Amino acid sequence: MPKMKTNRGAAKRFKKTGSGRFKCKHNHLRHILTKKSSKRKRQLGPKFFVSAADHKRVVACLPYA
């Protein structure tokens, strides 16, 4: 049986933690930032964890994570 392929786009976006959860960065924080409030940009700053609803999909994309 051939090796499973890792989804390279997902590999660049998600990192697995020691507890098995996946962390990633918020979107909407790359450009066109002048119209966004300081509060909104600050809240988008820290990393967040993938929800339980999406966890199965991320695991399927990253078989060796």
UniProtKB/Swiss-Prot annotation:
Entry keywords, A to Z: Ribonucleoprotein, Ribosomal protein
A Pfam family that the UniProt record links to this protein: Ribosomal_L35p
CC annotations in GO: cytosolic large ribosomal subunit
Molecular-function annotations in GO: structural constituent of ribosome
Family: Belongs to the bacterial ribosomal protein bL35 family.
PANTHER family, sorted: 54S RIBOSOMAL PROTEIN BL35M, LARGE RIBOSOMAL SUBUNIT PROTEIN BL35M
Name used for this protein in its record: Large ribosomal subunit protein bL35
